[in-house]
Amino acid sequence: MSRGHNIKKSLTPQISCSTSESYKQLDFLPDKLRAKLLPFQKDGITFALRRDGRCMVADEMGLGKTVQAIGIAYFYKEEWPLLIVVPSSLRYPWTEEIEKWIPELSPEEINVIQNKTDVGRISTSKVTVLGYGLLTTDAETLIDALNNQNFKVVIVDESHYMKSRSATRSRILLPIVQKAKRAILLTGTPALGRPEELFMQIEALFPQKFGTWTEYAKRYCNAHVRYFGRRSQWDCRGASNLNELHQLLSDIMIRRLKTEVLTQLPPKIRQRIPFDLPSAAAKELNSSFEEWEKLMRDPYSGATETVMGLITRMFKQTAIAKAGAVKDYIKMMLQNDSLKFLVFAHHLSMLQACTEAVIENKTRYIRIDGSVPSSERIHLVNQFQKDPETRVAILSIQAAGQGLTFTAATHVVFAELYWDPGHIKQAEDRAHRIGQCSSVNIHYLIANGTLDTLMWGMLNRKAQVTGSTLNGRKEKLQAEEGDKEKWDFLQFAEAWTPNERSEELRDEMLFTHFEKEKQRDIRSFFLPNAKKRQLETSCDESRVSQEKNTIVPADPVKTATRGDESDLEPEAKKLKSVAIDDPCRPPEEQPCRPGQAEALLTFGICKAKAQATTPAFCGEGWQCAFCTYINNSVLPYCEMCENPRGGAVPQIDSLNQTQNKNKNEKDDSQDTSKKIQTSSDGEKQVLAHSTPEPLAKSKEEISTTESEDRLTPQPGDEQLKNWPVYDTLMFCASKNTDRIHVYTKDGNQMNCNFIPLDIKLDLWEDLPASFQLKQNRSLILRFVREWSSLTAMKQKIIKKSGQLFRSPVLALEEIAKQQTKQNSTKRYITKEDVAAASMDKVKNDGGHVRLITKGPKPGDPSTKEFLEGGECVPFLNPCTAQGDLILKASTSKGYLQAVDNEGNPLCLRCQQPTCQTKQERKADAWDSRFCSLKCQEEFWIRSNNSYLRAKVFEIEHGVCQLCNLNAQELFLRLRDAPKSQRKSLLDATWTSKLPLEQLNEMIRSPGEGHFWQVDHIKPVSGGGGQCSLDNLQTLCTVCHRERTAQQAKERSQVRRQSLASNHGSDITRFLVKK
């Protein structure tokens, strides 16, 4: 039965670019977005509007589907709230795009859902961003909140995630999309390999339009009964009537190819690299092939699971067999120093082999697989895009093959193939997309006599099916075969063995006592003691630091003053060049000593320990005639008041008036600082003590200031009259991106935002034309200078506060004042502490307590006494029951929670009622632990070490805050290196002075905890326990050992003084003048 007669004839999706009337509908868009859209993108928006906002935008990857979806959703903004469903790794890039193109949205109006219980802001936010990973069967609280919100406009990015009818996320999303009035589905590969993958997406947009699933499968999937032995199965993996399906899809789907609408984009050149494997490498694979051939001769001899399991095993064996050749190929490509390229693989074993090749070549790289957190992936992408020293990106086809941009690469290498052409094309177009300026060469490494040859044929057959369905014509992966003689060296590659299969560590692979007790560095005999040397050379270091800053101004974040850093410097760092990575500093500007070439080659950049001194101007600066501030000699304007160098001395009255004005502005800034959201709990002393001092401008700011008049277009008199002049501005930092939103001094939104790094690079396109005026521009420059002087942790504290502020430094002080002082000598909150707080709350205010657990096992005696089916335990006698309840709560897997007299469960953190007022299901009790995401985060930071490390790593990325060493990168390099090379890698770095057992443990089983720790700025012994993020910092292992030893020494001195005071008086008291 054909459904074609029941569907209206398709409107032509390709709207003429010359028809200006078609674009009049787009006048509603923000000016910046409308000016940025390309003609075919405007056609896509018009196509959706003609279909009342329900369609699929299926443009090929890299054609800008995101901005089209934002434009469509903006047309229906009166019908918001808007729900955006994306892969988990794309939540923050989507938030960045929303803030960029719709600047009228304030930061608090965009909600990025963090976990399955983060539902507090769904009902109040205009835009909600949700990751596919949270749509699981146990996310009942989240699913209920999404259904109750009744979203009228929904965007589903990478909608092919809904391809499976049986997947949980497909069943959850289907009713939400169907119920929405407007629904935009985005995907570059609607069908990855078969027509059956289209049905759920079509059903979400237009239910029953293509009939039931059975009707659709029979008509377009060639559905039939297939027998495996004696068992029958309904097979829907085929394809039929594809031309008819293509015609029907054109009514609800618009699809353009890059070759049709983006002809100026450089071409994509595919090439197959076939090679033969050495017989030793393919030994296991050959035996599996023989087993597979036996099954194929007698199809009744094995079940489907046996066949599929064998194919999966052969797939992995193919990866291991060709890994040695892949390593040699990558090393060959690395011989070209100017080449940046991507390497895609599927199995972890192949990813490991590719990583080893890069490490052995001593090249800087990034690696993204399923274990890398979503927030860290964006950081790694930016590193590859902007750092010229990072030449290779090793990527998982599934984890990094969608949504990310790697246009800095000109070559793509597929170390492995995958099962469908959709994933392959998605991975190809990470580099071949808008923004690519060079042709992209794609190399497929095909090992003859392996599963590769079969998979290549299968990929081309599937490509013909998807091409006929989506594009109306048969297609295949056009790839020319490379010169076989050119790649003959691959067949002589050595067989590769994964680390887990490698032989036991031999003695020569570990450090020994003899090596650790080798002679001291001869230079140490000619140097005084560390503290004496520090005093003698402090002036010289300051002068050298000032000279360095004069030539190449350093990053203000990395040159922040730390008074006790020299005391904590380990001997290994004083006598030996360390290999650390500083992407912001060119390699030619980083000092290297002779004899440290190995360290330089191993870690890419050789850099001396960062000097932590306050810039001192020993007579070489110039004094401002306006404010008398002594500036660096290279600055053309005063750093404090923006007065030009050499300017006339102002009149006294004018000076006094200006000073009074500045004083009033400072007072106003403290009075008018507006609180949008309460800040996190923490220690005022830490923030107040660590407020940064003014630092010298960075190179970008200097160049911006010097060339301001030259680069800024000179407006006419009429424009000058129309542009407003601001004497002060207010700012709000986005919680989820790097953008800063701009407000007037009255707190009114200016509908614009910017990224501080763009301003430092003299990119002002995100700000209105009125910021061409020097007075307006100076306000932004001053903010960027202060913001850049803060550490990443302090910036995060301001972001979390949600405050409106004039100065980030003053905002940090305000946050410190608002925080309650808390002193605790306990490192973490325990279950006993929670139980005691709950019992005290009930004792004082009434109510009862209950023990909440996550999925308690039936018949568990530890929970039966307190909890039956999620019910509460009434509070009886606090004098007799408290001790027993607390004891049993500490030994169980749950928490003792207080419930008030009205039946509302109270938050474990703040003892306030949570958002869950009525518990109807067992799962709700566990989800009602916290009243908000803020309380949940604060509780886990204070009680869970793994969560604490993850949050600090998200901000500081494993970089030591004392010596600026990238300890996380060293850990990844050592973890991914062959075991035989780990010893030499460690011996060339700062870790060489660590204890013997610790070094050998790093070689045997390296872990993050061996390389960096999360340290309390105010120590736990001094009352800094159970703290928030503001009292935490990342330290490498050497700095942490030194700081811990110093603190132990100080505590010992305090104890001795306290003991001595019990038996006598301090003699220094007699020397004090009365």
From Swiss-Prot:
Keywords: ATP-binding, Chromosome, DNA damage, DNA repair, Endonuclease, Helicase, Hydrolase, Metal-binding, Multifunctional enzyme, Nuclease, Nucleotide-binding, Nucleus, Phosphoprotein, Zinc, Zinc-finger. A motif (APIM motif) lies at residues 1069-1073. It comes from the Eukaryota. Residues 659-719 are annotated as: Disordered. A motif (DEAH box) lies at residues 157-160. Residues 662-674, 696-711 have a biased composition (Basic and acidic residues). Residues 46-481 are annotated as: DNA annealing helicase activity. It is found in: Nucleus; Chromosome. Residues 46-208 form the Helicase ATP-binding domain. Belongs to the SNF2/RAD54 helicase family. Interacts (via PIP-box and RanBP2-type zinc finger) with PCNA (when PCNA is polyubiquitinated via 'Lys-63'-linked polyubiquitin). In contrast to classical helicases that unwing DNA, annealing helicases rewind it. This is DNA annealing helicase and endonuclease ZRANB3. It comes from Bos taurus. The gene is ZRANB3.
